[in-house]
């Protein structure tokens, strides 16, 4: 066995050497002006007749591995390397034998991009990469198909190798990061190495770095000698950028700081715009298990083929759906056809008219509901009137919302947010919430709290202890506060005699308690949240109807049931039939 393996290795090496000699001879004939030069495409086809079967000793070698066919440097500028030519041939063959996605654009229209994110801090988890999302989304809006994203360390050789690979494969290459004055900013050097170039000071960049003032910025003026400078307009100021975007061939070198990168790309969109292509997309939300609808999705993709791309993405954290479907096409027609196709085949009622931007569109949706004249709409209108009165009497710095992650205060926060959007759209102050931390909170509740802070752009005022102790601490640390909005309902303990505006009792820290939801019921709260697709704590979908700490909160026995497989489980809180059993979750 060992002798046979050695023999086959030797034979394979001899075969590779023979192909290399043939390649060099054909290249010499071409460069010397042979009469066969006009037949170059045929010559290239002949040269590409490498073994098409997989080699058991080298399974990566052959048509799937274009490295050996890259060709000499003198031909790469003409043909992008024979590896690129081979890949084009392979794509043509695959198109006849494989089901294609809509992302494979029509020949002649396709503009592609590869993104290289540079930085040890990304690979080590020190910094979260947000540039990739922005670059992919923006390029797609410009008609550019992003084919590959790579994250590489601050190493010259590694960056150079990736730049070389990407430059030969894609229309545009965008790098992000590694541009600056420090030792680990090596992107300029790496790109120079990738193209056999050298770093030289550029007069315009030298002037720009001097304008920055101080010392240590000289490194920014050292760019590959073949670099081009692009001066765009800053979308934030309307003024020309002080520092240009540097490019070398088809590689564009962006800063890694997200704020700068976004401004530069917004100001340089014209460099990448592909007017021949406009991508169209649609998102569908399905309240069904992904495995159960997988056959339907496979049939749909096979039915529409190259006309449309269908993606399926499960979401275990959503209150409203289990799977998000994305439909992508270069034309609107296939999207509508696929929507009708899926509507007719997915489980009845599983498509959810979900609004992913419920917080951003809160004002429009909440006030529309308030003006609907429905029973719930009248409750919403009454709550908004109380909130608007409080906004007239107090400034935002004097108000805060009592928030513990429960359903009632979640509804209240959404109402308050909508009213501020409508009445004070230009006020920059973030909304304030008072969070009284319990001794042993649910991790899911803590996560929901953090998500809510980001979602609504909140400032959290944190306190501990009983309500009285927390209000005292709040008053001492934030003396400007005068009123707290509460999600109290009359059915809550000791709340039947409250008014919309109720001062705290004697002996308590002096605050005005504002109660917009006094006349709401358990069903009103859930109808409001679910109709407007307001995110709420996931524990409510697991059988909890009233949330406290882990010591005093259990799933509501009234929601216990059997799953389709016969296992005990719990229905979500919004399906509780008897509202009087709401507090059965508390022990």
From Swiss-Prot:
Annotated region (Molybdenum cofactor biosynthesis protein-like), positions in chain: 114-205
Gene Ontology, cellular component aspect: cytosol; mitochondrial matrix; mitochondrion; plasma membrane
Catalysed conversion reaction: FMN + ATP + H(+) = FAD + diphosphate
Biological process terms in GO annotation: FAD biosynthetic process; riboflavin metabolic process
Organelle targeting sequence: 1-17
Cross-referenced InterPro entries: FAD_synth_MoaB/Mog-bd, FLAD1_M, MoaB/Mog-like_dom_sf, MoaB/Mog_dom, PAPS_reduct_dom, Rossmann-like_a/b/a_fold
EC numbers for this chain: 2.7.7.2
Residues bearing the modification N6-succinyllysine: 378
Modified residues (N6-acetyllysine): 378
A GO term, aspect molecular function: FMN adenylyltransferase activity
Names of required cofactors: Mg(2+)
Keyword Nuclease: no
Disease: Lipid storage myopathy due to flavin adenine dinucleotide synthetase deficiency: An autosomal recessive, inborn error of metabolism characterized by variable mitochondrial dysfunction. Clinical features range from severe cardiac and respiratory insufficiency with onset in infancy and resulting in early death, to mild muscle weakness with onset in adulthood. Some patients show significant improvement with riboflavin treatment. Analysis of skeletal muscle show multiple mitochondrial respiratory chain deficiency and a lipid storage myopathy in most patients.
Function: Catalyzes the adenylation of flavin mononucleotide (FMN) to form flavin adenine dinucleotide (FAD) coenzyme.
Family, as annotated: In the N-terminal section; belongs to the MoaB/Mog family. In the C-terminal section; belongs to the PAPS reductase family. FAD1 subfamily.
Protein name listed in UniProt: FAD synthase
Species this protein is from: Homo sapiens
């Amino acid at each position: 066995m060992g002798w046979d393996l050695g023999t086959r290795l030797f034979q394979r090496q001899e075969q590779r050497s023979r192909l290399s000699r043939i390649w060099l001879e054909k290249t010499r004939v071409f460069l010397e002006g042979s009469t066969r030069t006009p037949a170059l495409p045929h010559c290239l086809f002949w040269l590409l007749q490498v073994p098409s079967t997989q080699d058991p000793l080298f399974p990566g070698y052959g048509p799937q591995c274009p490295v050996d066919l890259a060709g000499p440097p003198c031909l790469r500028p003409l043909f992008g390397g024979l590896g690129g030519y081979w890949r084009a041939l392979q794509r043509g063959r695959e198109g006849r034998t494989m089901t294609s996605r809509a992302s494979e654009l029509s020949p002649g229209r396709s503009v592609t991009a590869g993104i290289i994110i540079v930085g040890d801090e990304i690979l080590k988890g020190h910094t979260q990469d947000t540039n990739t999302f922005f670059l992919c989304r923006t390029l797609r809006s410009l008609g550019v198909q992003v084919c590959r994203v790579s994250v590489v360390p601050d190493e010259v050789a590694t960056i150079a190798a990736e730049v070389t690979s990407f430059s030969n494969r894609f229309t545009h290459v965008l790098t992000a990061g590694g541009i600056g004055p420090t030792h680990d900013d090596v992107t300029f050097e790496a790109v120079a190495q990738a193209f056999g170039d050298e770093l030289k000071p550029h007069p315009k960049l030298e002037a720009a770095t001097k304008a920055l003032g101080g010392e240590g910025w000289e490194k920014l003026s050292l760019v590959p000698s073949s670099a081009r400078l692009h001066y765009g307009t800053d979308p934030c100021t309307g003024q020309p950028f002080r520092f240009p975007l540097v490019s070398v061939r088809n590689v564009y070198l962006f800063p890694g700081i997200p704020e700068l990168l976004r401004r530069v790309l917004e100001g340089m969109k014209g460099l990448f715009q592909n007017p021949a292509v406009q991508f169209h997309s649609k998102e569908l939300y399905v309240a069904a298990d992904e495995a159960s609808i997988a056959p339907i999705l496979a049939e749909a993709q096979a039915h529409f083929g190259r006309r449309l791309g269908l993606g399926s993405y499960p979401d275990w954290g959503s209150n409203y759906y289990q799977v998000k479907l994305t439909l992508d096409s270069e034309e609107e027609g296939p999207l509508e056809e696929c929507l009708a196709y899926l509507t007719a085949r997915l489980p009845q009622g599983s498509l959810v008219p979900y609004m992913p931007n419920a917080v951003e569109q809160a004002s429009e949706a909440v006030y529309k509901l308030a003006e609907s004249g429905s029973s719930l709409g009248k409750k919403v209108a009454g709550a908004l009137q109380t909130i608007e009165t409080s906004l007239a009497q107090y400034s935002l710095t004097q108000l805060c919302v009592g928030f513990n992650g429960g359903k009632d205060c979640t509804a209240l926060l959404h109402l308050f947010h909508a009213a501020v959007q409508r009445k004070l759209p230009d006020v920059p102050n973030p909304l304030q919430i008072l969070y009284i931390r319990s001794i042993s909170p649910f991790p899911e509740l803590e996560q929901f709290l953090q998500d809510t802070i980001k979602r609504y752009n909140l400032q959290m005022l944190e306190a501990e202890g009983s309500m009285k102790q927390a209000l005292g601490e709040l008053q001492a640390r934030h003396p400007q506060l005068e009123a707290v909005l509460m999600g109290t309902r009359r059915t809550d303990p000791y709340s039947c005699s409250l008014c919309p505006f109720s001062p705290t009792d004697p002996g308590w820290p002096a605050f005005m308690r504002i109660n917009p939801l006094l006349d709401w019921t358990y069903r009103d709260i859930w109808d409001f949240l679910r109709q407007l697709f307001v995110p709420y704590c996931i524990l409510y979908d697991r059988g909890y109807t009233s949330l406290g700490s882990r010591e005093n909160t259990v799933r509501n026995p009234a929601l216990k049931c059997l799953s389709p497989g016969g296992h005990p489980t719990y229905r979500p809180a919004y399906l509780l039939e008897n509202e009087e059993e709401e507090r059965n979750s508390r022990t």
